[in-house]
Amino acid sequence: MNSPAQASTKRNARVYRLQPAAPAPATVAASPSGVALVCTEGDRLTSAKAPWARPAPQPLHPTEFPIPSAGKSVIKVGLDIDLQHLTATIQWDHLQPKPARDFKTPADLVAWVKEQRSAGHVVYTVYESCGFGYCLHYDLKEAGAISLVITPTLLDRSRRRKNDRLDSAQLCLRLARYVDGHRQELHVIRVPKVSEQQRRETGRQRAFWRGLILAMANHGRALRLEHEGRTLSGHWWGPRVWKRIEPELTPFVRAFLEPLREQILAAKAQVDQLTVEIEARVAREKIPKGLGPLTLALADAEVCDWFRFADRKAPASYTGCCPSERSTGGVQRTGRIDRHGNAHLRTLLVEAVWRLARWNPTWHAYRKLAGQLNAAGKLPKRWAVALARQLAVDLWRVRTGRSTWAELGFLEMT
């Protein structure tokens, strides 16, 4: 028999789970097109706005935890995905999780979820982000489950034992605590829409083909160096350079370089085609000189949606350019950047900083560090990383309509 105080605590706990978190104080203003823009405290709102502006970010976590009808259960499913099968540990309500079971195909798991949903149960699923993409997540959501995808995690540090059943059991236990209100148990990621994922993949395919060109070009240099004792110049596969060096090659080396050159030219044509497609996305925009349409379009694709960030700290953290920290008490120690973020975006931003330092030195972030130049008048590398973090914040401000390029000090435009 529960006491009145215990009953009150349980009722309050249930109400707490149903109510979404209170939003942060925000200023709402109308843009020229009539779309409301939300500006949190500390960011200035201007009339400039990105073409796809909308008022609120997409939440990572469910805004409420549904309660099943009388006599029905809340089912928590921890999933470990493999190419051959799916291992699932299932917990009904707050009972002991059942031993892990295997589903031969994702379709079998989706059919099982549909069966439980048709019976009136609430189903939660969780699995780690991996190379299998988000197809399973889309199917589970369509089947009626509340599907969560998390970052790859070291689930158990205390044991030197790891297998599919142990991993799925740990995910199930963490999911149970997450549903009970412990949000720190799972690091939920934002799953992109299909259109966003395809737009992002275009830029990554371009990077893939560029990597192939570099690998094949280096292979050709190594081939000539081994058999002729001489190397090949940069872009040796280009028509002008190839016309000059072809008579100098021995028949043996030429026999291998000619088909290799054809493959490089085919890959180069693919890169050029993807570059035109990517730059066309921002062809009508005025872009700061040094940033360039290619970098801006690739950054937009990697972020997917700039409105996903609620404040300026979020895009800075997403780059992985924040310093690591090991502090205790009154002692604070910071170290190298944590690299906990999007590596593709981090590379784009760091490269853009070096160009902006030359072509747009009036950028407000660069002016602050003008006195930190070294003896050669160049920017130290550690400051370039800090500027890359600030550039992510400035891109977020511009793409969400909080500021303009001119207000941030970008005067040279293309």
Predicted regions and their residues:
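Intrinsically disordered, low-complexity and often Lys/Arg-enriched segments
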Residues: M1-I75, P99, A107, L411-T414
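Nucleic-acid-processing active sites and adjacent nucleic-acid-binding tracks
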Residues: D93-V123
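Phosphate-backbone recognition surface of nucleic-acid-processing proteins
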Residues: K286-K289, P293-L294, L298-A376, P380
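Short alpha-helix plus adjacent loop in nuclease-associated cores
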Residues: L148-V188, V331-H340
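Gly/Thr-rich phosphate-binding beta-strand-loop-beta motif of the actin/hexokinase/Hsp70
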Residues: P68-W92, L171
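A short, charged helix-loop
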Residues: L173-E201, P239-P251
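Low-complexity, acidic/Ser/Thr- and charged residue-rich accessory regions of DNA metabolism proteins
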Residues: G330, A370-T414
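Glycine-rich, often acidic, oxyanion-interacting loops/wings at catalytic, nucleic-acid
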Residues: E201-K286
